Amino acid sequence: MNQLSVSFIALIIFLYACRPARNIQTTPPVTDTIAITVTPTGNPKEDSIRIIKENYNRIIAGRIQYNTFNAKIDVEYKDADGKEINATAHLRMYKDSVIWLSLTGPLGIEGIRAYITKDSVKLLNKQDKIYTARSVSYLQDVTELPLDLASLQNLLAGNPVFFDSTITSYSLSQGNISLLSTGDFFINLLTIGDADKNLHSSKLDDLDTARPRTCYLTYLDYENKKGQNFSTRRTVNVTDKKKLDIKLDFKQYDFNETLSFPFSIPKNYKRN
């Protein structure tokens, strides 16, 4: 696998690295109903429930909204051995329909093009002239999680992932509010700013205590040039038996522009 292929996988590798060792189950649909269990500390107060409800609703209201989204992203990947890979990702998304991704190297030569829909994952390896087509279950095979188009779009747009509406507790610290939720796969400690209500970080701990793995995502350098609070710099840090770090630096981005999603298969490409 060439370096650009590795860079593409790096965009979802944190999910792979902290995947639970269990069979995939269908994720229940997200609803607006909030199931709240407040961990009692002394005498529970009604204010605790109110604070959790208010901040959960603010997180949901603060999600990036779009019909189409496109961005130019500098991707930096560093593995446990200190090996670094740098690439530029050109990303286009049509909500709930398609993810289109093109990865280029330092010389501006395109190496990988991806086309992901609800049903399929298609990859063009332009360096080795190989075409790969798989069902969308390929995402689940790679990550061993119920990852689908919608959750991958949320990840790329900067929305919370694996954040369950059943919140077990909250905490206040240094101007931040942290909400703790327990889902089918992860315990998610999600932190937002008390003042700006922007998503600051998400700490995902695997429920499988036999093989503890942690993913830490940060959302930095917010700006509101397009009418939405958008994190232009993000980091993904994975700690398992080995460690890896990913940095995503959004150089350009736009919402709701007319986009094309070109993906044609040259006749001389081998099918994988």
Map each language-model feature to its residues.
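An acidic-aromatic
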Residues: 98-149
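N-terminal leader/targeting segments and the immediate start of mature chains
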Residues: 19-74, 80-84, 270-272
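C-terminal motif of bacterial Sec signal peptides marking the signal peptidase cleavage site
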Residues: 14-17
